[in-house]
Amino acid sequence: MAQIGIFVGTVYGNALLVAEEAENILKDRGHEVKVFEDATLESWLDYREQTVLVVTSTTGQGQLPDSIVPLYAALREKGGYQPALRYGVIALGDSSYPNFCAGGHLFDALLQEIGAKRLGDVLDVDAVEHPEPEVISCPWVEAWADLVDAQ
């Protein structure tokens, strides 16, 4: 089974809740999973030939939460090319604001730039439609786990 790092960017804790639910699902499927809240580039690089799941909310005018900005900046500046990396993104946001789910899409664009292979589509979770984000994220994680298993 796969080694999966879940990297979280959260402001109010919803992204962490989604990440913990994803961790449970993936562990139940036999994967080795670790959640990182204030991740460093070093912890990310441990997975550069493995699989990562980025779970992040959006804050301000479409920015990433402070907890994941240092990782994003370090990846952009020093992450290098990572063609062996497989990943997924769960983006949380509120559709009543401009730049809905932009934080997750920023991270997705960066991972595309560094050559990583996305498994499946980015999941956009709208707080307006889904005040309990795990209702939509858990089925997505199950389907994403199928893609991970197929690798």
Curated annotation (Swiss-Prot):
Monomer. Residues 4-145 form the Flavodoxin-like domain. Binds 1 FMN non-covalently. PROSITE patterns: FLAVODOXIN_LIKE (PS50902). This is Flavodoxin YqcA. GO terms for cellular component: cytosol. Probable electron transporter. One of its GO terms (molecular function) is flavin adenine dinucleotide binding. The keyword Nucleotide-binding applies.
